[in-house]
């Protein structure tokens, strides 16, 4: 079947008065990008990251890349040790800049409902969305408002991802945020979900 290879790199930017939520000066700190792999049948998969920055934490250990045995239910197994994982994790620091010219201004108290709807439209399953929300909600809901903007190249250009064999569907959702004391006007974005077909890889994270 002809591969769809849908690349949807989506950066959710929640921005406050001085920069991304987890940043220092011009340095952004991508937090918890995690990668799920769902092949059609059990197979060995190698994942490498071309990151424009410095990796500060990876699990399992990154080394020169990560090779796992992936199963259709998302279970990943280290072929050398037999240890099982449900995702691959990394964090790092980068000077990448994100585009806030379009997005959404969302009240902190409305964050959970907004993310449930947005992540569904962006193609995440309920389980994937739940894990995203559980991690990011405590950082966002206490702010009066958050500016949220979904991007493509702003994230993928600084964090190139190579998966071998290549997935038929690739979804990358990335969240960088900054809290606001008052609402702002921003050009709204149109969110669309890719069709999840055949071997699917899903990544989410933020900064």
Sequence positions of predicted segments:
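Protease-labile, long low-complexity intrinsically disordered regions enriched in Pro/Ser/Thr
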Residues: 23-207
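C-terminal motif of bacterial Sec signal peptides marking the signal peptidase cleavage site
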Residues: 15-19
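Hydrophobic helical h-region of N-terminal Sec-dependent signal peptides
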Residues: 6-14
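Positively charged n-region of N-terminal signal peptides that target proteins for export
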Residues: 1-4
